[in-house]
Amino acid sequence: MVASTHELFNIHPGWLKLFPDEFAAAFAIVESLQSYHPNKDYVFKVFESDPESVNVVVVGQDPYPTAGDAMGLAFSVSRSEKLPKSLQNLFKELQSDLGITRTDGDLSDWQAQGVFLINRVLTVPFSHANGHKNIGWEDFTEKIIRYLGERGAVGLLMGKSAEEMAKYFSKKVITAHPSPLSAYRGFFGSKPFSAVNALLAIPVKW
């Protein structure tokens, strides 16, 4: 069952070798749900990457609850118009930090460079932020994050939920979350992108 399901979700086989039981449990969570974001095909999109290619781990909370926003990568959307506020703020800080102006909300190019954009919770009910908290996702994603951190990846941890994972990273950048509620409480001016690049042998082209 695991093999056929992983093919359906386009998960890199390296993850299945590392965490066969954990993925079986994660697939069961998805099958138990009715209506949720992102689309089922995108729930495990972050795992399309080879685990050996991951150099940076960006930890989010859960997918965007608005229809059409979530696409399986933390903070990312599949379009360039009407970006969510958190992503707008992320891009404002990117401009301030590195002088990079970005309007494309699809962060797949970051993923292609070894940036692992994972939410602690991989699904969300329609229009109900954090509505799938404590249904099993946190245990699954914590094991993944721990593996990557202990393997030497740099952690970019924005917000309290992400900061809970700090213990697994020897190299990390911790800042406030870019949401409108907290962006002015430590995120703006934190220069997280240059800070992450300073910890890498090959910097990310944000």
Pin down the residues of each PLM region.
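Charged phosphate-binding loop/patch that engages nucleotide di/tri-phosphates or the phosphate backbone
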Residues: 198-206
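Short, Lys/Arg-enriched, disordered terminal segments
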Residues: 1-7
